[in-house]
């Protein structure tokens, strides 16, 4: 029997995995990534399974960390688009109007015009605390004089008379309402001639 196997040379024609020219068959590795230790003792199946799991977990964690790092390095920074989200025009206008009304408490500037003057001036109404202070400032600003104001006659007899436009769009004489009410309702000022002031207030 031995001579028959030798004659046929079955060992030479045997199929096996391995590099060409190597006579020893390659040992079957228990799992990828595990280190084969030369030992006469055979390890238990539970120990081999735990080693395989630990190697797989370490490989997967390394690959996950690498992929996360690559994603962080490649991902561009998010830039907020200007004008997004869109706001309706009426809502935008109301928001801007609220900001203007709230303001920063610095001042309340009003336009002042004078009959015959080709220019306008601006004054801060919050600077003044009473009518006399305001009238004095207007006289110095436009180099004019006002007569004394009375509830019955207004500025009767003076060359010029200061008037203001209220919230309703009506033109009234400066001094016909209490100061606080005037400050809250005044939109702009205009100095007119005394003759043109008839029909306003008491004139």
Curated annotation (Swiss-Prot):
GO terms for cellular component: nucleus. Residues 107-199 form the PB1 domain. Induction: By auxin. Disulfide bonds: none annotated. The keyword Repressor applies. Homodimers and heterodimers. This is Auxin-induced protein 22E. It comes from Vigna radiata var. radiata (Mung bean).
């Amino acid at each position: 029997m031995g001579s028959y196997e030798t004659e046929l040379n079955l060992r030479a024609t045997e199929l096996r995995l391995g590099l060409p020219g190597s006579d020893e068959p390659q040992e079957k590795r228990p799992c990828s990534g595990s280190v084969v230790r030369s030992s006469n003792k055979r390890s238990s199946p539970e120990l081999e399974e735990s080693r395989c799991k630990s190697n797989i977990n370490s490989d997967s964690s390394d690959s996950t960390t690498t992929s996360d790092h690559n994603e962080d390095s490649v991902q561009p920074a998010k830039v907020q688009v200007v004008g997004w989200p869109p706001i309706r025009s009426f809502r935008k206008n109301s928001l801007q109007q609220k900001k203007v009304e709230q303001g920063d408490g610095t001042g309340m500037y009003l336009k002042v015009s004078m009959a015959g003057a080709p220019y306008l001036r601006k004054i801060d109404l919050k600077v003044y605390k009473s009518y006399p202070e305001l009238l004095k400032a207007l006289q110095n600003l436009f180099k004019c004089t006002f007569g004394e104001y009375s509830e019955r006659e207004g500025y009767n007899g003076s060359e010029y008379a200061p008037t203001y436009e209220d919230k309703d769009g009506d033109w009234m004489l400066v001094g016909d309402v209490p100061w606080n009410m005037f400050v809250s309702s005044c939109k702009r000022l205009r100095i007119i001639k005394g003759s043109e002031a008839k029909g306003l207030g008491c004139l």
